[in-house]
């Protein structure tokens, strides 16, 4: 009798475990956005959606934006940069005008949850095509990238989260080149608490303008966003010889 009871008890435990595993498989953990939105009150959620619209004034493709396109960039990197702006680690140098404007803009963000919402929203968007404006020697850029960049940013510029190296394959060429120049000039990566920024600032010292253009042109050409036709290409017929 006791043996039968033990058998039934064991059978019941196994059945319960199978049931729990089945429920877990059918009910996976919610995606980050679901977790964020469930945490937010309706009023706060509506406000965060308004913040997205505010961000798109400078970071959208429909406006005369001069900020980088953020669509498809990694959540962890976007969140980290927003927090750096909010804490004053970035955006406090008036000589770096675009970054200084961002330092002013993030004052609209009230808390970490709103930062998380914004980072998550942009990370979920499909990367947008970009006009390729940076010209360089692709072969030299390839050699430079493999020797000095791939170890932290990945063989295909896909990023390396463990080394805090963001993906470079979603960056527009003009923005990529601008940021490298700012690292080199000490306009970015100067704050004592900006550990990853300081690494980049040190790594960019002594790099020539030609080498910067070469590596940016290579990364964008080999791994970057889909090529977007320029305004001239869109307005002038393909066979036209007339100047624009």
Predicted ranges, named:
Residues 73-74, 80-81, 171-172:
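Extracellular/lumenal glycan-associated surfaces
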Residues 27-29:
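Bacterial signal peptide processing site
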Residues 32-61, 134-158, 232-239, 244:
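Sequence/structural segment immediately N-terminal to covalent heme-attachment motifs in c-type
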Residues 2-15:
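Bacterial N-terminal signal peptides that target proteins for export
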